[in-house]
Amino acid sequence: MHWTRFKYQLGLFYKTVLFKLGFGKLLLKNRYGEHILLFHGIDAVGETNYNDRFVSKAFFEEFIQYISTHYNVISLNNFYQKKFKKDTLNIAITFDGGYLNNYKYAVPILEKYNVPASFFITTIHGKAPYLWTDFLDIVSYHTDKTEIILERNLYHKNEQHEFIWNDISMKNVAKALPYDVLEMIYKIFKDDWEALPPIKYEEYWMLMNAQQIKEIADHPLFTIGAHGETHASLVDIPIEEAKQEILNSKIQLETICKQPITEFAFPFGFYNQELAYYCKEIGFEQLLLVDYNTKNDAQNDKWKNRFVINPYISMEQQVACLLKGSYTKGI
């Protein structure tokens, strides 16, 4: 883990130096490639205090304008059908989570540049108005609490605003918890959440409603896919619960969209063979990951890994890394 992080930081530093030395054209030289991009949230300023999942509206528009001008940006369906162009970067765009800010900021920009995208929705609406990950990120940052107890374990707040027990963050522990236990986190931080001015923070947790999801599903540029029901790590909860989460999200979205939902993105990118084959059984034709578990998995045409957007680097660096297909490699 430490070696991977070091290579990542070294790779970005290397590109930064090259840009400053005037080698930007070399770094941005077009080349053949195939990448599905993964965005999460878009906000007004690119806030990273709460998480590493949001980029600013200005960054997003600059990025979309650049890639739509210089490369071949295609729909996810066309990407799966390998409708690629030679000697250029071929890109499909996806969003995970179902944030309202996608509807507010991303959709108008994508429409402006006529860029297709797929939105993967977490159907938690019947249980909570937010994803537990966002709730925990925001209250952990703002709470005055320094210690809390969850499942008889004592967590201490560190300088990074994370609650830690036994060198493990509460967020990592929570990924594997059943939802009824996750609801205990809501109760622990209930007063902290209610003390937050909602308008100031709503961009970081509010989700699209059914009408907005349906509007995107009906748009000729866009498609809707499923992303689970509660954003649990499906490989860490009991297998039958995981399957029910997948099925529920499909049924709920098909009810909203009035059309088949055939795309599924695994929360956190975590998957296993049994869950992947279950997705196929119930009608999902395209499965989106982050990284493949094995080299053999990369040979499955229905499974695709994705290139996660980095909110900490410039647009030029992001494009350079995308062209190279890595955050750690040089030119």
Per-range role (PLM):
Residues P108, K214, A276-Y277:
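Alpha-helical segments flanking ligand/cofactor-binding loops in enzyme cores
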Residues D43, Y113-F270, D301-K304:
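Metal-dependent polysaccharide deacetylase catalytic core of the NodB/CE4 family, i.e.
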Residues M1-T94, N101, V139, D218-H219, ...:
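C-terminal active-site subregion of NodB/CE4 polysaccharide deacetylases
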Residues G97-K104, I109:
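Short acidic, Gly/Ser-rich segments with clustered Asp/Glu that frequently serve as metal-coordination loops
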Residues I109-K112, E281-I282:
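Glycine-rich, phosphate-binding/catalytic loops in enzymes
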